[in-house]
């Protein structure tokens, strides 16, 4: 039977009064809801669920900005062909699989040794009818795109991932979803697809807030 890992303030922190327990719970809730968040060297976007919708008679695009600056990548859906592609901006790169964007599973290593390119890469082709016909990403698939914010040959380049979900059908009105992303703020450092900040920093922050309040109460 799995051990209950919830934080029981009544048992582990007997000196914390009800007001302080409420403060700790509030601090944890605020910390967990903060977007983006950072712990260690990983910077995480939080859940985004940005959408790219196929539009009849015109091409649709979605700008993706990983670090709060300029656009880093552009996801496009061409209605005339049904092709979904990603392009890199400002010499940023994507992890490729030949002419396509490689779909990575959770835990896959992304870093300086990854095959990468600044070229436009295709994810999938749904054709004019909206039926998936080809691509490195299959219909209805969720996966991770490996990316880098800069040249693959630079030791200062941050590596990261973008989680993307493709629709089961590619008819007009269907949507591609960019679920979330993260990157290593330390240049040249590899990251695992799907890696996010751990909760330890949030717990420490909350406990610190409780301790500060307790010290102030005793001093009053």
Each PLM stretch: what is its role?
Residues 11, 27-28, 219:
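A periodicity- and composition-biased signal for non-globular, repetitive helical segments
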Residues 16-26, 32-44, 184-212:
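Short, threonine-centered small-residue motifs that mark membrane-proximal processing/anchoring sites
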Residues 41-195:
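A domain-level signal for the mature, folded cores of soluble proteins
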Residues 1-18:
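N-terminal secretory signal peptides that target proteins for export/translocation
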Residues 211-220:
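C-terminal membrane-anchoring or membrane-association module
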Residues 26-27, 57:
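Short amphipathic alpha-helical surface micro-motifs
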